Amino acid sequence: MSQVNTSQGPVAQGRQRRLSSLSEFNDPFSNAEVYYGPPTDPRKQKQAKPAKINRTRTMSVFDNVSPFKKTGFGKLQQTRRGSEDDTYSSSQGNRRFFIEDVDKTLNELLAAEDTDKNYQITIEDTGPKVLKVGTANSYGYKHINIRGTYMLSNLLQELTIAKSFGRHQIFLDEARINENPVNRLSRLINTQFWNSLTRRVDLNNVGEIAKDTKIDTPGAKNPRIYVPYDCPEQYEFYVQASQMHPSLKLEVEYLPKKITAEYVKSVNDTPGLLALAMEEHFNPSTGEKTLIGYPYAVPGGRFNELYGWDSYMMALGLLEANKTDVARGMVEHFIFEINHYGKILNANRSYYLCRSQPPFLTEMALVVFKKLGGRSNPDAVDLLKRAFQASIKEYKTVWTASPRLDPETGLSRYHPNGLGIPPETESDHFDTVLLPYASKHGVTLDEFKQLYNDGKIKEPKLDEFFLHDRGVRESGHDTTYRFEGVCAYLATIDLNSLLYKYEIDIADFIKEFCDDKYEDPLDHSITTSAMWKEMAKIRQEKITKYMWDDESGFFFDYNTKIKHRTSYESATTFWALWAGLATKEQAQKMVEKALPKLEMLGGLAACTERSRGPISISRPIRQWDYPFGWAPHQILAWEGLRSYGYLTVTNRLAYRWLFMMTKAFVDYNGIVVEKYDVTRGTDPHRVEAEYGNQGADFKGAATEGFGWVNASYILGLKYMNSHARRALGACIPPISFFSSLRPQERNLYGL
């Protein structure tokens, strides 16, 4: 946006400025709720004030102004507005359009430009890339052209959003549809996407939140809530919600005190949402107290629950947008899950009760604590203490206990309990694995699934297959050839880096907030900060012994069953930097040797092509392998490299990732997806692996993006200076941007 000239002389500065047109008090970049709200409805404006909407003054009018009124404008360049010039530069982006009929314009736009009929306008569409729209000054009588994929796709998005607000006519600022893409994407993430992804349980929305699109069985047709056995207030709340909305057929059930793998399997056919933390609210109109859930964010797409490690990544982005209440709510929910379900769950559905996800609670609680005001806020201190108490319980009872702990190495593995076939996968996901067993027993595939789940057919090899499959899903990296058939036996660098971080964080917490003495309410044991630091030191030594490969510069996973270090080159090696467990020498070798193997056009690949191996019909591509890149890998690597003094490398990697996201956003109708192909410069969002790409299936306008990808964009921009931001806005590829830099500027990117 242009800068306002404030040095216009004493008369100009002292004179009260008169609002002469609508554009002077309407923000073209305001939230959709404001921009398309009732006050901006053209039909209402016509009734109240039928003339002179956003009248642009010509030079002839200005020349007739008295010398007194010209005071302070002497430094402004006077340019005449061309009567037929419809270029952006001629108007400086200040024009406004009048869309007399939103539906009609929307249909005309799609008919002319959406040639592949997917309700999006992209560079792959072959339309004329131009559309005439009416001017606001003439109330649509005169027309000008909107040109190009980016502006037309933004017009489609704005018309779609306006229609969703029930608008039939709109004024539309040119600046809104030709906004710098970096600014537009940032604005949408902070003001729209986070709001669309935020959930908060109340009496009126329980049924909608409880719906599950991942499972299609007779028992899953009705929404269902499972409540911990010791939460009677919540049980009564959900029963009340069910009674208030009988048409929803909401079912409410208590969970048993002891949750076993057998119990979890028994309710796979009747899955339900698991209750989360709630707080009391006082209703001033009724004088009654009621429960309401703490807010939380969901990843998006088919993932409509509170997820484990997604929530930490999203919390970082939410805090940047000052949505502290949502980030804080997710910490509350994790405390609740540990206290009532025994662990931070993969997600809050009944079929996830045996399965956790990568642990980030200590760091998550710390960043929320700081945002809440730290020690100066008693509520923040209370939250931190409860979060660390829960984290210590999780550390002891989940990650350093059987079956996840390997007693010989002292390292931990993704090794969840569970029985049967995971029900949340696509119905045919395991068919190729199960078909030989069905043939062996002379039954159909569906019959075999039922017999196996019921325990009437025993197949030890199949049991082991699903043990590792559940481990893969607990790791958050579902799926990858890195873990296939071995996950539960692997002491991974990612998990053990996180546990090292837990140990360091807990040591600091005990020293700072517990007078260096912590009594665990679980087992009444007493620990000090020195004891936790010693545990961290021991883990660090074991990680180096079993996982570090000096020659390659990678931390590799260690197979505890065959007692052998693997050689799968994964981006999770940089988690050792994020956790702070690597030595300076190890960090240097990682940057010199490991990084070049993983750094691609669009950032870090999940693994190297060599490690992934060949792809064929019988060996299909996996989404957590090369050539795909994921937001959490970028976020943790950026912070890890920065903390070890490699900020310039972080700048380079962040530019690559942000370029890829921005390019897809500009060329493909504002798309933001779960993962990207970091080797592709044209359509990196196009991922044909497993269940496709969440965030790509929308009509007209993307309203959610994808949780941790949204966060990665906002976090990545913190590493960009103004020069880099301008280059991103112009979609300049990394190779062109880096090669055009002066020598001193190249140093900023580790080149």
Curated annotation (Swiss-Prot):
Residues 45-55 have a biased composition (Basic residues). Coiled coil: none annotated. Activated by calcium. Activated by protein kinase A (PKA)-mediated phosphorylation. The modification Phosphoserine is found at S20, S21, S23, S60, S66, S83. The active site is at D478, E674. It is an enzyme of class 3 (hydrolase). Pathway: Carbohydrate degradation. It catalyses: alpha,alpha-trehalose + H2O = alpha-D-glucose + beta-D-glucose. Present with 1840 molecules/cell in log phase SD medium. This is Cytosolic neutral trehalase.
